[in-house]
């Protein structure tokens, strides 16, 4: 049984997750070149790790495209994400993550403790517990990463800031009665 919930105020709970995404080789992948040619063009391009933080109440999202998912990278990402939410007028109380190694590390624990934030983890093998960020991952893949055939990873990354701005400020959400996340955030001055 899946129980749906929504916290009462922005910052009551922030869902955090990492999405691993294959890089696009220069010249394009299979969407540009076709399946057979795309296979020949893919070797050694590696992965991008999309570190995501989504507010439970407003669905306001913060994402960075980083090179890895280590115990050093995740806390550094959270420091910047926390500043993003604070600048938007959101006081973060709790963070929900899966049980990835970077979220079980001492640096992650310490960065949350320094800010007075409670850390909650999902039960193992229950990604639906962190469903709001998992749904955000799916939306991000459908509407940005795989929305059109990019000819390089640089082209795809260059398109990301505009997509994220649209997601936060203009894209309506069914769960928010068709309103964008920005409509539920008390202070978006300077954006």
Protein language model annotation of sequence segments:
Residues 60-64, 120-122, 146:
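Short small-residue beta-strand/loop micro-motif enriched in glycine and branched aliphatics
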Residues 17, 53, 59, 77-78, ...:
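Mobile genetic element proteins and their domesticated derivatives, centered on retroelements
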